């Protein structure tokens, strides 16, 4: 039986007796609008944990369609299980949720079957906004950027880009209307875009605009397990794709280029000094006086530096470097796909197929990836079209090679294209470094797993010292994107602080910018410390790559909020100045100038200091003494950490054994994942997985080949197992092995 909701109905007294008490009903307004438009509420069951709630204005006998923006993995999620109109209350079951819908104000109480209330929603027709409860525990998500770790207490206008916002410390803003309540719920506001006011116990989401077709479309998830919440978001917007292995190595960015010799000299120095590096990135002319191309947005090479681009690329490739140039689109819109036809006589840069065609000549020369900058004015659909273009476009010419692109903009769903994201043009200050830890955590919780920052900060300030650079470098070694970039670019290479040369300054247009005094540019410690963290990053690649693979199956980021693994530890949930690196490592970056110690909260359980191997009981804050070369790292008891040899680039061949370090104190398991690192052959079974399990009570380690995988070279595999100073060597052939200690 259908009724039409309107204020006129309310005045006629059609509210009726409530099936359950909804607290907000006692706070109804007395005003009314006789001409209010009737609303139809659609409830669609997505899974046992997630349902869709759509508020659609009635247009005669029908409702408007819900527009698509590209964020969801599909447009249709099946028929609604309920279409509610009318002024009486309605009780609806959607998976594990029980919904009680009341007509005035339009209120929805969401509870479990046992009556435990999860959330209360209320639609305010006067302001066209949705009110919900913030709860008493932290709120996370809302994309990259934002002024605080716990989103409670903030007003978020959800404006994308770098202008008008606290760019200097907080970086660019990539807002995503996905909000997580750590008490066990989350919401993705699919349409339309809007503002979050989280400054009180009752939060408000106000769409930027509503239309005759749609008032609001959201997806609601309820689950006590944080991993389930992340998996449900991935169900809606997609799982991350596997990036190429080389993108997880070190990436060195350049700015103003003096000559061909300078470009080759940087590459040569990395190899001569044996400082691991995989990627060389070149800024475009227009963003600096002399970049890789001739002008902003151009695909023509700068002949003063790259007189023979193909020969130059071949030379860099021969030294095992990947090459990534900076690109800027000159249109504020982008539509279509790379598969569409492009009329070259009517070239339209806003058409993805036409714009991608402009890349293909340089790509054919040997370009390995792209750095698409800017895009702030783009709407959501255009941003996602751009991300998709840099994923699908390269595959037109190299169908079995994983693409790489480093973006400054995106939206929900960008993870489906293995997009990397960085935080924009931040300033070199201690406050910026400090801010980027919670910023990184919320970015990962918003479904963006591949994130990083300009190590050292983009704009140098009087705070830009060797110490700040080192601390930022240490943090960067534990970000998915490990990349140095910024003005005074010669101070961004690991040996730059011992040459006396900061490079072209290029700071004239930045208030508060400054170049370090030349007396500071002879510090030999910097290269030594950078080497330590470069080598550690490369040694940990087996662990990191396995965690990236795990994310493609679960939606979990590599940089993880402590909440994801310790949801019942209130101190861990509210901790925003440290994070988990995968499931085993706890990373506590040093963000204070001249720090001699670092306060670290260790969640409940036992922990091992990575550097000293000292075992410590968690559930408390400790004080870790530090020097300049030490960033506190802890490993969770009950962990198996695979480590490889030091390599100069990710694809370097080595006969050295794989090392498995066991951190005892609890049972442990780990899936080591390997594939060729470049192709999509893993989709067809070309991958190797080694299942590892540690039995704490028996002190035994079991190794076996993962189901549906097979051995990859070298076979047999030499494995060194370490436990409390003891070492055992074993050859793994694919057959199960059990070792005792």
Task: Describe each PLM feature range.
Residues 632:
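Long, structured stretches of catalytic cores involved in phosphate-ester chemistry, encompassing
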Residues 1-246, 255, 260-262, 267-268, ...:
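N-terminal accessory segment at the very beginning of proteins
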Residues 116-629:
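Catalytic-domain carbohydrate-binding cleft regions of carbohydrate-active enzymes
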């Amino acid at each position: 039986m259908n009724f039409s909701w309107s204020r006129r109905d309310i005045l006629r007294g059609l509210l009726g007796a409530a099936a359950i008490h909804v607290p907000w009903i006692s706070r109804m307004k007395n005003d009314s609008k006789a001409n209010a438009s009737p609303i139809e509420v659609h409830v669609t069951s997505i899974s046992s944990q997630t349902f869709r709630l759509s508020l659609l204005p009635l247009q005669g006998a029908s409702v408007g369609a819900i527009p698509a923006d590209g964020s969801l993995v599909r447009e249709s999620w099946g028929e609604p299980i309920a279409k509610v109109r009318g002024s009486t209350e309605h009780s609806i079951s959607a998976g594990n949720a029980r919904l009680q819908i009341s007509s005035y104000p339009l209120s929805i109480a969401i509870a479990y079957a046992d009556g435990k209330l999860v959330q209360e929603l209320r639609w305010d027709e006067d302001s066209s906004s949705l009110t919900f409860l913030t709860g008493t525990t932290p709120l996370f998500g809302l994309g990259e950027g934002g002024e605080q770790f716990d989103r409670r207490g903030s007003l978020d206008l959800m404006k994308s880009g770098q202008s008008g916002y606290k760019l200097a410390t907080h970086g660019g803003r990539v807002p995503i209307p996905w909000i997580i309540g750590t008490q066990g719920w989350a919401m993705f506001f699919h349409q339309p875009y809007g503002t979050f006011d989280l400054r009180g116990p009752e939060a408000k989401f106000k769409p930027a605009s509503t239309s005759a077709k749609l008032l609001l479309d959201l997806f609601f998830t309820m689950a006590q397990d944080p991993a389930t919440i992340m998996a449900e978001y991935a169900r809606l917007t997609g799982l991350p794709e596997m990036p190429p292995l080389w993108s997880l190595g070190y990436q060195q960015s350049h700015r103003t280029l003096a000559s061909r010799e300078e470009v080759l000299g940087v590459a040569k120095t990395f190899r001569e000094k044996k400082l691991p590096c995989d990627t060389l990135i070149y800024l475009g002319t227009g963003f600096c006086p002399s970049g890789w191309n001739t002008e902003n947005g151009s695909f023509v090479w700068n002949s003063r530096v790259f007189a023979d681009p193909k020969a130059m690329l071949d030379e860099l490739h021969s030294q095992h470097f990947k090459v990534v140039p900076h690109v800027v689109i000159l249109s504020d819109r982008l539509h279509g796909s790379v598969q569409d036809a492009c009329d070259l006589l009517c070239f339209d840069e806003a058409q993805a197929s036409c714009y991608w065609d402009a890349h293909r000549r340089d790509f054919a020369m040997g370009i390995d990836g792209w750095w698409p900058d800017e895009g702030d004015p783009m709407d959501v659909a255009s941003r996602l079209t751009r991300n998709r273009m840099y994923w699908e476009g390269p595959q037109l010419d190299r169908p079995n090679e994983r693409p790489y692109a480093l973006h400054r903009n995106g939206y929900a769903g960008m993870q489906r294209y293995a997009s990397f994201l960085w935080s924009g043009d931040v300033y070199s200050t201690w406050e910026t470094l400090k801010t980027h830890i919670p910023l990184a955590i919320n970015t990962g919780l918003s479904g963006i797993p591949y994130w990083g920052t300009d190590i050292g900060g983009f704009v140098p300030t009087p705070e830009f010292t060797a110490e700040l650079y080192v601390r930022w470098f240490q943090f960067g070694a534990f970000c998915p994107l490990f990349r140095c970039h910024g003005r005074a670019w010669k101070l961004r290479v690991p040996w730059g602080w011992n040459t006396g040369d900061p490079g072209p300054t290029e700071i004239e247009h930045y208030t508060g910018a400054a170049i370090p005094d030349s007396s500071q540019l002879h510090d030999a410690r910097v290269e030594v410390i950078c080497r330590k963290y470069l080598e550690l990053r490369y040694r940990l690649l087996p662990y990191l790559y396995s965690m990236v693979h795990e994310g493609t199956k679960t939606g979990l980021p590599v940089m993880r909020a402590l909440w994801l693994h310790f949801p019942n530890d209130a101190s861990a949930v509210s901790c925003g100045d440290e994070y988990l690196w995968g499931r085993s490592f706890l990373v506590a970056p040093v963000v204070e100038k001249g720090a001699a110690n670092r306060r670290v909260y260790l969640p409940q359980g036992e922990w091992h200091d990575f550097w000293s191997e000292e075992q410590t009981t968690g559930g408390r804050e400790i004080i870790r003494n530090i020097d300049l070369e030490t960033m506190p790292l802890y490993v969770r008891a009950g962990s198996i950490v695979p480590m490889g040899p030091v390599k100069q680039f990710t694809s370097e061949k080595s006969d050295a054994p794989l090392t498995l370090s066991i951190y005892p104190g609890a049972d442990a398991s780990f899936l080591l994942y390997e594939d060729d690192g470049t192709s999509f052959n893993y989709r067809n079974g070309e991958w190797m997985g080694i299942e590892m399990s540690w039995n704490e009570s028996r002190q035994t380690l079991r190794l076996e080949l993962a189901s549906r995988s097979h051995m990859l070279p070298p076979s047999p595999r030499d494995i060194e197992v370490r436990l409390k100073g003891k070492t055992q060597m074993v050859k793994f052939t694919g057959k199960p092995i059990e070792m005792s200690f």
